[in-house]
Amino acid sequence: LSNCHCLVHIDKITIKKTMLTMIEEKYMRRALQLARMGRGSVSPNPMVGAVITAQGRIIGEGYHRKYGGPHAEVNAINSVSGEDRHLLKESTIYVTLEPCSHYGKTPPCSKLIIDSNIPNVVIGTEDPFKEVSGRGINMLKEAGINVITGVLKKECDELNCHFMTAHRLLRPYILLKWAESADHYIDRIRDIKEKPTVFSTKITSTLVHKLRSEYDAIMVGARTAKLDNPSLTVRDWSGRNPKRIVVGRKNFTLEGS
């Protein structure tokens, strides 16, 4: 009987932990959804989303909207209504990226969380930026806040693969893009008077423009630049234009640069 009682007790603990994990992942997925709304507007900063819950419901949420502007945590805390402000002292904030701990273009979010008396923080992944890199988590813990890390870490890392690569590997994140036929034909050798072979459809063209809006720069070879003088701008999607880079053996400037 004692063994049966022990098994029941263990099962209850397992069920409770599973339910907590499901809740954490539910709100972190919402935070990820919010973070994506900043795509194309926050670079070189990362996309970040934040959700605040209390008594089983969301009382505030926000995301980093624009480079140099308020961070996700600030927008989430500011979104809490006056009638719900008293719930902050028993709330949990879910953030896709470790809250910052330094003064940059904005004050540290970790300090704001502490000053707002939020007792629980759930973090998707640590910030690899050298000015943060675990310091935000330590600041929260030293203030007596319960901190959980690594919830949907893979998804949170992938969200900011450009930012993560830059700070973890100290190099740019590079995507190779080209168009070819099913039999691997790309283009013929031609001169400036001849038009290039076109494979792109309206759908793939829109996808390319979406990708352009998500990157800081586009690089092409000097021959492509001379033959086609591509604008490399964002036209079929919203977002800012990337910088144009031409690689060649001699100095070369695109028209309109």
Can you say where each PLM-predicted feature lies in the sequence?
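Short beta-strand scaffold segments in enzyme catalytic cores
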Residues: 48-56, 178-179
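A structural motif shared across PLP-dependent enzymes of the aminotransferase-like
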Residues: 40-43, 47, 68-71
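Short glycine-/small-residue motifs
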Residues: 61
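A short, polar/charged loop-to-alpha-helix boundary motif
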Residues: 65-78, 199-205
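Zinc-dependent deaminase
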Residues: 12-41, 58, 84-85, 103-257
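Mobile, glycine- and charge-enriched loop segments
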Residues: 77-103, 253-254
